[in-house]
């Protein structure tokens, strides 16, 4: 077991991606214990205050303030809760739903497989952001509906990967032997199919997380995601777009955080695929 983990950690992409992701988890923790101010605190005398590298005399707000005089560092830390939190929660939900449906579809085949395929193909035919917008328009904006919308967007890709892996496993002799010995369908799916589908689930989960973060930010930027006063990073970008010429740091700092967070999960996905896919591992 230790040798497996050591081989995984030798992958540069995986190591760098995990390090970056750990940094954002640290930001989430710091938002509870080390945020200088509340994200709602307003300082009217310090509207659009410059960050420390532009104004050496201004040390009260390290990253400056927004147009209302709210501390950007505090809002950035609290915003990490929403961006990272929504990404994790929606990814977990999409794995639970799509993996279950994919295994059921791959095992039972027939009408069940056909029905689920038609549903997922219908969802996948709609561009991801447009699908998220449709869900938001139907259900309304807000935190819970944002989580639901990005979860639904992630379902088709996860479902197809798990279904393909389940179909491959179902064609193997040990599944047929288990059925001949009288093992129940639930036992076969839980004890045999699910463990052998974990590799594509792990790889795709990192991709689902980055897609969830990106879609959440896009919805927030359009004013349809997490609503004020909560400082989700996409919402912060939307609030700052009118001040990009006079206070560009209001957009560049949250935007750079989004870039690094998405980059970290993409690197994790690439590293996991390189190490867990036998074809790529043998080629390397």
PLM features: residue spans?
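Generic hydrophobic transmembrane alpha-helix motif, especially the helices
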Residues: 62, 66, 72, 93-98, ...
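Membrane-helix/interface signature in polytopic inner-membrane proteins
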Residues: 163-179, 185
